[in-house]
């Protein structure tokens, strides 16, 4: 099977008229590799990365794949499979994330008991299924509006310690805002799931198509229902302090091919 290396397209190299169709090329852990996969006069290609379907969007006269790179990916050469017939290589670069230490007063959110761990496991399966869902529709672009105005209080990828105990890296962007502040859908989509979860609190997950999914956590109230069609700007809930938090804020997560990626790369 032929192995073909195709040059990666940086946004700065794209025509001005097509800039909004593709995210920033950021080929590092937690980032997005933007890869040219062929001329747009051909049908939209079938692209996979690590056995997961990858979003492909039209950008001018080309098809571009937007590959979410896992936070734990090692630097080096990786590849995507295009139309099950050829491999396209790309390079994962090194990228350093800062450390964050937080104090949580409710100890159950640091050391859950057995019953709580069982609940966390059940909820994780529900959340993972929604975040990894594939809906085969055309996606015109990945640019998102900010879901709420506020201070970006914690960035993506932070290596986190709760009460000095190491925990998973931060897989979203925290936006500090007053409790009750309305959260707006940043783009068109369908509500994939809602729930009140142990760590995430009241949560909404929105499917924007082709594995492009956004998540909103710690809400004070949920204003949408599963399966509901959304247009950009529609309210989906309100900022709160439910779940594992140190104060009111929105945890905003963005996902491609089931992988958490930095929301800052997608915000307009």
Positions of PLM-derived features:
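Intrinsically disordered, low-complexity segments enriched in proline/serine/threonine
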Residues: 17, 29-31, 149, 265
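Bacterial N-terminal signal peptides
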Residues: 7-17
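A short local loop/turn or secondary-structure capping micro-motif enriched for an aromatic residue
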Residues: 55, 64, 74, 96-99, ...
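Catalytic cores of peptidoglycan-degrading enzymes
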Residues: 145-268
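Surface-exposed, glycine-biased beta-strand/turn segments
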Residues: 21, 89-200
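Cationic-aromatic interfacial patches
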Residues: 20-90, 94-96
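Positively charged n-region of N-terminal signal peptides that target proteins for export
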Residues: 1-5
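Generic marker of residues within folded, mature protein domains
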Residues: 11-13, 25-27, 37, 46, ...
